[in-house]
Amino acid sequence: MLFTSVLDLPTSTRALPYNGKRIYLKFYNKSIKMRNSPTTADAIAWTAVKRKYYCDRGEWLPFADANDYDTTTTEEEDSSTTTTTDNETNSDDDI
């Protein structure tokens, strides 16, 4: 069963911050699509969440280096992103 929204996630994810829920949702659904069992998908999703957050007395907090591990980008986003520098742009004067 795929989750369609963070509102559909299991009760075990309620204490997560919104972005933690997004991480769980993405990894759970991707794992299910790869034909893993719900139990395995849950374990994979929690592993992804725990790369970015830790639980301290019931509160989920981001690691100081949490942005070093980007778990929310997709391959489509990575391949479609391009950057242009000033040196790469052509003006009509250059032609």
From Swiss-Prot:
Database matches in SUPFAM superfamilies: ChaB-like
Region (Disordered): 65-95
Pfam families noted in UniProt: ChaB
Domain of life where this protein originates: Viruses
Name listed for the protein in its UniProt record: Uncharacterized 10.9 kDa protein in LEF8-FP intergenic region
Gene source species: Lymantria dispar multicapsid nuclear polyhedrosis virus
